[in-house]
Swiss-Prot record:
Contributes to the RIGI-mediated inhibition of type I interferon production. The keyword Cytoplasm does not apply. Its main location: host cell. Residues 14-23 have a biased composition (Polar residues). Residues 1-23 are annotated as: Disordered. One of its GO terms (cellular component) is host cell nucleus. GO terms for biological process: negative regulation of cytoskeleton organization; symbiont-mediated suppression of host cytoplasmic pattern recognition receptor signaling pathway via inhibition of RIG-I activity; viral translational frameshifting. This is F protein. The lineage of its organism: Viruses, Riboviria, Orthornavirae, Kitrinoviricota, Flasuviricetes. This protein is very unstable. InterPro entries: HCV_core_N.
Amino acid sequence: MSTNPKPQRKKPNVTPTVAHRTSSSRVAVRSLVEFTCCRAGALDWVCARRGRLPSGRNLEVDVSLSPRHVGPRAGPGLSPGTLGPSMAMRVAGGRDGSCLPVALGLAGAPQTPGVGRAIWVRSSIPLRAASPTSWGTYRSSAPLLEALPGPWRMASGFWKTA
């Protein structure tokens, strides 16, 4: 018997394509923003707005990326809407017909005027990632806090207030 190891097939070096890099960075940004929203009180619900992907595709048109739409009275706990894997934008405040920050986390919270611009959708982040006990493990989302408008910041001192 030979003690030499069997020759292994050499795997070709595969460099990630632009599409791979774009989608992975989009997922990372989405997760950080979702987590910031969750820390503001939404838990497994976030208020989402359709927008353009970095590639220029419009989420309204691209069926594979669009979430199912929710009725105007739906909100956390009532919405049948689900979040597609590549939702590009999250609403950072209660402006321009978006979901009200004060309504986050309330069962049956109504959508604000401007139906169709912003909808309640389930977050793709596991519920346990949004729990208060895990907040300290997601410090990488800190730069996003500065970009959030006043209503999203908690007055407890955990986040800066306006």
